[in-house]
Amino acid sequence: MNIRPLHDRVIVKRKEIESKSAGGIVLTGSAAGKSTRGEVLAVGNGRILENGEVKPLDVKVGDIVIFNDGYGVKTEKLDDQEVLIMSESDILAIVEA
């Protein structure tokens, strides 16, 4: 995938979740709901501050993140993959193993 996000934008691939119902039935896809976790595929150079300096992003390629799946998060299809384009501010946490 050849894509380079600009500024404080981040490209994330949503991770599939598997959950079970109260009866033990495995729910996948739309029945399980959309995951708000994903893997960072690409990051921009950083956020431009008011003084013109560029602040590097805290997230890096390969990080597993929890994100806000709301307004401002754009879904795109690239190389037959659905990816999300978001600002770093839409990322709530980095999952550390």
From Swiss-Prot:
Entry keyword annotation includes Cytoplasm: yes
Biological process terms in GO annotation: chaperone cofactor-dependent protein refolding
Stored Pfam families: Cpn10
Keyword Lyase set for record: no
GO cellular component: a single term: cytoplasm
GO MF, one example: protein-folding chaperone binding
Subunit annotation: Heptamer of 7 subunits arranged in a ring. Interacts with the chaperonin GroEL.
Job of this protein: Together with the chaperonin GroEL, plays an essential role in assisting protein folding. The GroEL-GroES system forms a nano-cage that allows encapsulation of the non-native substrate proteins and provides a physical environment optimized to promote and accelerate protein folding. GroES binds to the apical surface of the GroEL ring, thereby capping the opening of the GroEL channel.
Record NCBIfam families: PRK00364.1-1, PRK00364.1-2, PRK00364.2-2
Recorded family membership: Belongs to the GroES chaperonin family.
PANTHER family: 10 KDA HEAT SHOCK PROTEIN, CO-CHAPERONIN GROES
Protein name according to UniProt: Co-chaperonin GroES
Source species of the chain: Cronobacter sakazakii (strain ATCC BAA-894)
